[in-house]
A protein has these predicted regions:
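Negatively charged, low-complexity tracts enriched in Asp/Glu with abundant Ser/Thr
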Residues: 1-32, 105-110
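Intrinsically disordered, low-complexity regulatory segments enriched in Ser/Thr/Pro
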Residues: 33-80
Length: 111
């Protein structure tokens, strides 16, 4: 069984403990953005085989985009092939599985 706390640190994520004791995994990027990782309930991931949600924010904390992964191993593969905090990794994470902001939708009702 994977020790997810250790595995996130090995991938280059920082561990931040919130006031309520919840742990958030964060990776900073050079363009003043950062990515957080939670489970699909917004909590600290505890199992390798659970959905993970990545959310990217700007330096003011405004949501930019999100990606979803079915398992930690999917995320791990992308992170292992690219340097932590690199622009390349940020782009790959963004493109992996995107949850679009409303302003990015393109459809007949949203041209």
């Amino acid at each position: 069984m994977l020790d997810l706390a250790k595995e996130f640190l090995l991938l280059g994520f920082l561990e931040e403990t919130e006031e309520d004791g919840a742990v958030t995994y964060i990776m900073d990027f050079p363009d003043d953005t950062y990515v957080t990782v939670t489970d699909d309930n917004g909590r600290t991931p505890v199992r390798a085989k659970q959905n993970l949600v990545l959310a990217c924010y700007d330096k003011e904390g405004c949501y930019l985009w999100g990606s979803e992964f079915k398992t930690f191993m999917e995320l791990q593969k992308l992170c292992q092939d690219n340097p932590a905090g690199s622009p390349q990794l940020l782009q790959i994470l963004k493109s992996a599985s995107k949850t679009l902001k409303d302003s990015e939708w393109s459809s007949p009702s949203h041209p």
